[in-house]
Amino acid sequence: MDGYARVGKLEKDLELGNGETLYPGLSYGENQLRWGFIRKVYGILAAQIVLTTVVSSVTVLYAPVNDLLRGNSGLLLFLMFLPLLLLWPLHIYQQKHPLNFVFLGLFTLSLSLTVGVSCANTDGRIVLEALILTSSVVCALTGYTFWASKKGKDFSYLGPILFTGLIVLIMTSFMQVGLFNRMYNMPTTPLACFHKLIQIFFVMTMQMMFPVGPTSVAIYGGIAAIIFSGYIVYDTENLIKRFTYDEYIWASVTLYLDILNLFLTILRMLRQGDN
């Protein structure tokens, strides 16, 4: 009887993967499928990060590219808003191969160019420090989220909190750049209005990337770093528990944006501290 009990316990352990599942209640088969999905997402994410590193390096090291982007405010503004435009077809065609990878590549490329411009205007030592700090934070938060999910912890409650914080962050950027005063003093002719709107959005975008004042940068950067760190935990848990197996593109996009925003926030804070 004791032998039968041991065999039964062994079969149960095999079915549950010796208890080493991603989160409690997940069967052994689902656990294997989920791990395959996670590896696929992180593979795509790694490719995005490599592409961003290469494109940013070219932008920094190849002077004509950097001069072209810095000297053409219209082109830089277009590249800043292009990722927002690409998010719509990327979401629509996320499950249609090869269009999903085409739009993902364009999305990553457009963001990489703007990151390159930010890095080109920053001392190399600061860029390296920001890269090391971001990598450390991402690895620590990712490891913690996997461990916490295995212990049965749930971070779904963070979604509304982080979204509210992000909205407050964006509205703060608008107020810093004086958007509402600029809109109130709009000219009357259509052409002048159009030019004014272009100026507003350009200044607004630059202010969101480079807020003015050391106190403003410290407060803004600290809150932004907390929010994007929270999003890494929240989206990593979504990767573990909630994303379907067909949403590998969208899962990689969310994590990529979390990491990129955290890097730019740390870069901004270190640059201001160095100044």
Predicted regions and their residues:
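A hydrophobic alpha-helical transmembrane-helix feature that marks the membrane cores
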Residues: 1-275
